[in-house]
């Protein structure tokens, strides 16, 4: 069995708690309706994708190695903020209510916008000069 660094696990836990709280706060602002676009979930997933792209590129390419930054910010915060499972439940609910176009549009737009967000964040980090 592999040894775990409990400080790294604590970083994931702390980041996950903060990300989950941020998502819950945003979700509380708007109630779900299967006939409308689920903006809270869409927003946190796209923002989370951007942040994962930003943090991953910045931490791997621009900052000194730290064993706690990636678990705290990437796995923890962004993992807690984003919610693929809620997106799936919302899509299924749309399908159950016969909102076929909305379900297809939501799924395709979520995937495309998420990929674009990661790409843009990566380009942004790589465009900024590194101070030495």
UniProtKB/Swiss-Prot annotation:
GO terms for cellular component: plasma membrane. Na(+) binds at residues 79, 82. One of its GO terms (biological process) is cellular detoxification of fluoride. The chain crosses the membrane at residues 9-29, 35-55, 72-89, 100-120. It catalyses: fluoride(in) = fluoride(out). InterPro entries: FluC. It is a multi-pass membrane protein. Keywords: Cell membrane, Ion channel, Ion transport, Membrane, Metal-binding, Sodium, Transmembrane, Transmembrane helix, Transport. Its main location: membrane. Na(+) is not transported, but it plays an essential structural role and its presence is essential for fluoride channel function. This is Fluoride-specific ion channel FluC 1. It comes from Mycolicibacterium paratuberculosis (strain ATCC BAA-968 / K-10). The gene is fluC1.
């Amino acid at each position: 069995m592999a040894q775990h660094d409990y400080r790294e696990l604590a970083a994931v836990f702390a980041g996950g708690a903060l990300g989950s709280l941020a998502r819950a706060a945003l979700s509380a602002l708007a109630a779900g309706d299967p006939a409308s676009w689920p903006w809270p979930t869409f927003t946190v997933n796209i923002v989370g994708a951007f942040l994962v792209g930003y943090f991953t590129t910045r931490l791997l390419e621009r900052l000194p190695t730290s064993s706690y930054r990636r678990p705290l910010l990437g796995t923890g915060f962004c993992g807690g903020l984003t919610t693929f499972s809620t997106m799936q439940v919302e899509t299924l609910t749309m399908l159950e209510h016969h909102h076929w176009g909305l379900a297809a549009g939501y799924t395709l737009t979520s995937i495309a916008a998420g990929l674009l967000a990661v790409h843009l964040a990566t380009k942004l980090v790589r465009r900024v000069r590194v101070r030495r």
